[in-house]
């Protein structure tokens, strides 16, 4: 099959629509279930590149959760501790495979954004991973293969309409890629840049120490950014992205957006949140939404009399601003990557509030000295990668 007709393009009025190979070769995919759409395939192919590179860079199984051509989360398959298992809603599942841990992390970092995601997996989808996917609201999954039982689990999702795509892991795209905008053809070389520890050698701060665990987190953040709509920054910790700021025109707005997501990830681990008692039968999405509101500024929307009874068995206490700040002050060792240079030190001021200790960015701003000085003020270690990672 060298082309596949789609229902429509980005929007229902954009017809006809298809994906195809310009050279007449076979498509490197098989649709095993469902009928993926135009945006599904954009998410799938971007996500597949991301997890393929994460696996190559770390040697660990990788997963990503994509929405509208940017990742909501990305991770490698490190084991989950009890707290992370609980906030990712997999504490009832024992001895998860590394791939399942990777997806639990990718989906769980920003559950609000990951709702209705398209999943990419670096390895053959196993039963553990399929069972996590089974109970989440998701549009589809792409992987290099599926265990027979895992495939049956996924095929049963959405009354048999769940999108399952198998991709040829050995497929290598052409070195030149093209696209059209307004009838005009753009052509460029593919971004074949390899992201590894060699990019982290130029440490420009007083603090020169970047431990191996932080190097892995920085690599995860940079590979994630390579497939995130620009401008973008990514906070990472413990083998996963914990806050991704995508598609902002202002660098500091990226840093704030991603920092707020990282804060929410950590606030969900606070005792005040872990102790919430939800009513029986509450939907996962409603539970996620309630937590998101509870840890935010509009907490009374879920604590008001006549409202909390629909969500909680027992009325929770207010999680005060002072309590939240005290909890966030414990977050440390976070890695931060950026797809382009930080123009001002205010980005580092904001990053420090979310526990950032390690930074990787291209450098090249006329105010690099100011950014370095701000990092030194907080004891951060920052590497200049000298590479830009714009993605559009």
For each of these PLM feature ranges, what is it?
Residues 1-199, 214-232:
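Active-site loops and adjacent core secondary-structure elements that bind or stabilize anionic groups
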Residues 23-35, 109-115, 189-208, 285-307, ...:
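Gly-rich Lys/Arg/Thr-decorated short loops/hinges at beta-loop-alpha junctions or inter-strand turns
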Residues 53, 227, 264-268, 353, ...:
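Conserved helix-loop functional segments at active or binding sites
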Residues 57-65, 164-167, 230-237, 267-278, ...:
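Flexible, glycine/charged-enriched surface loops at secondary-structure junctions
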Residues 70, 125, 237-240, 248, ...:
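Active-site-proximal loop/turn and secondary-structure-junction residues that shape catalytic pockets
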Residues 72-111, 242-342:
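Glycine- and Gly-Pro-enriched alpha-helical subdomains that act as flexible
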Residues 117, 121-122, 135-165, 170-172, ...:
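C-terminal binding/interaction regions
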Residues 175-210, 268-285:
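Substrate-contacting helices/loops that form the catalytic groove of nucleic-acid
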